[in-house]
């Protein structure tokens, strides 16, 4: 297994730059004053398809040979990777098949179909999406592009942190949402090269703490599909590639509750006029857990995406759940 390096992130950046948005870096004076720190949000909710996933998908599809492109690609995803592969394939005239769970957010399903992909549904609690995807790939000769455990996907995801660090300079800490580990591992490659002294934290839902268990035990831990509002982090385990990078480059894995995610969503909407999906707030909520240690520090937080059904969003942020004090 050849693990990707920062050199692969650089190559990915050059390969996809004509397709991706250079997403904005957002700040809040009020938040900085309250925390006594400089906080920089990387707004991947403003990326094409509304999430960082487009970076890795575009890099992976772009690297396919003409022969593989002609046969088509297949991916399995709860939503953002599905849209990312569908759009990447459309831009490069590659047929795409996407395996999506029956309970995937309607917004994400509709967007994926809108990009022209063929969608196959499955039950995420009783069926194995990876097995379905690999079987279809073998039967039809599709190129399988998994949502996180793929060198080209990891390299593409790392371009977000690369942009952040190039814009704001070296950081003392970086907080990154964690599902399967594609964004965290890619971000770690970038941060270790561009900001060697930066502490890197992955943040996942309490209900899905397989990453934390894996990090502390030294081997990949598998769990049942977690029930959490962070649908983009409903993964059962880290990948072989992502875990190898995380184990060597990440300082710690934190967990946060759904209530903490809601509080962060509410703050971003009310104070910064930014709409994000629950998964995007994992890094923000994790930073708040460490706020006493961040006083006087320069901190990066990646907001991973903004694909959330508006009715669901309104229900979540209008609730009375208590979260961390911001």
UniProtKB/Swiss-Prot annotation:
Annotated residues for binding of pyridoxal 5'-phosphate: 80, 179-183, 304
Disruption outcome: Cells lacking this gene grow as well as the wild-type parent strain on SD medium, but fail to grow on hydroxyaspartate-containing agar plate.
Entry annotated with the keyword Protein biosynthesis: no
InterPro entries: Ser/Thr_deHydtase_PyrdxlP-BS (IPR000634), TrpB-like_PALP (IPR001926), TrpB-like_PALP_sf (IPR036052)
Source organism of this protein record: Saccharomyces cerevisiae (strain ATCC 204508 / S288c)
GO molecular function: ATP binding; D-serine ammonia-lyase activity; L-serine ammonia-lyase activity; magnesium ion binding; pyridoxal phosphate binding; serine racemase activity; threo-3-hydroxyaspartate ammonia-lyase activity; threonine racemase activity
Keyword Nucleus in annotation: no
Function (record text): Catalyzes the deamination of L-threo-3-hydroxyaspartate to oxaloacetate and ammonia. Shows a high specificity towards L-threo-3-hydroxyaspartate as other 3-hydroxyaminoacids, i.e. D,L-erythro- and D-threo-3-hydroxyaspartate, D-threonine, L-threonine, D,L-allothreonine, D-serine, and L-serine, are not substrates for this enzyme. Exhibits no detectable serine racemase activity. Is responsible for the 3-hydroxyaspartate resistance of S.cerevisiae, and thus may be involved in the detoxification of naturally occurring 3-hydroxyaspartate.
Cofactor: pyridoxal 5'-phosphate; Mn(2+); Mg(2+); Ca(2+)
Ranges that cross the membrane: none
Protein's UniProt name: L-threo-3-hydroxyaspartate ammonia-lyase
Family: Belongs to the serine/threonine dehydratase family.
Chain positions with N6-(pyridoxal phosphate)lysine modification: 53
Subunit structure: Monomer.
EC number assigned by the record: 4.3.1.16
GO biological process: amino acid metabolic process; modified amino acid catabolic process
Entry note: cofactor: Requires a divalent metal cation such as Mn(2+), Mg(2+), or Ca(2+).
């Amino acid at each position: 297994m050849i693990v990707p390096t920062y050199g692969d992130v650089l190559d990915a950046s050059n390969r996809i730059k004509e397709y991706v948005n250079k997403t904005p870096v957002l700040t809040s004076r009020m938040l900085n004053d309250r925390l006594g720190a400089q906080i920089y949000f990387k707004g991947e909710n403003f990326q094409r398809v509304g999430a960082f996933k487009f970076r890795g998908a575009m890099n992976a599809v772009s690297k396919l040979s003409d022969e593989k492109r002609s046969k088509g690609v297949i991916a399995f995803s709860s939503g953002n990777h599905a849209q990312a592969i569908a759009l990447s394939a459309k831009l490069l005239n590659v047929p795409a098949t996407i395996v999506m769970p029956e309970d995937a957010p309607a917004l994400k399903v509709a967007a994926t179909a809108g990009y022209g992909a063929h969608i196959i549904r499955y039950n995420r609690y009783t069926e194995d999406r990876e097995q379905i995807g690999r079987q279809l790939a073998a039967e039809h000769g599709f190129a399988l592009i998994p949502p996180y455990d793929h060198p080209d996907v990891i390299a593409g995801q790392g371009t977000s942190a690369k942009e952040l660090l190039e814009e704001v300079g070296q950081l003392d800490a970086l907080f990154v949402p964690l599902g399967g580990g594609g964004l965290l591992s890619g971000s770690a490659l970038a941060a270790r090269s561009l900001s060697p002294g930066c502490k890197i934290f992955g943040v996942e839902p309490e209900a899905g703490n397989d990453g934390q268990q894996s990090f502390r035990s030294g081997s990949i831990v598998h769990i049942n599909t977690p029930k959490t509002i962070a649908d983009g982090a409903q993964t059962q385990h880290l990948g072989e590639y992502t875990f190898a990078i995380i184990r060597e480059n990440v300082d710690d894995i934190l967990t946060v509750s759904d209530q903490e995610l809601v509080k962060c969503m509410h703050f971003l909407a009310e104070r910064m006029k930014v709409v994000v999906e629950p998964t995007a707030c994992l890094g923000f909520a994790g930073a708040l857990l460490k706020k006493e240690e961040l006083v006087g520090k320069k901190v990066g937080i990646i907001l991973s995406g903004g694909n959330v059904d508006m009715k669901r969003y309104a229900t979540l942020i209008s609730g009375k759940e208590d979260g961390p004090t911001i």
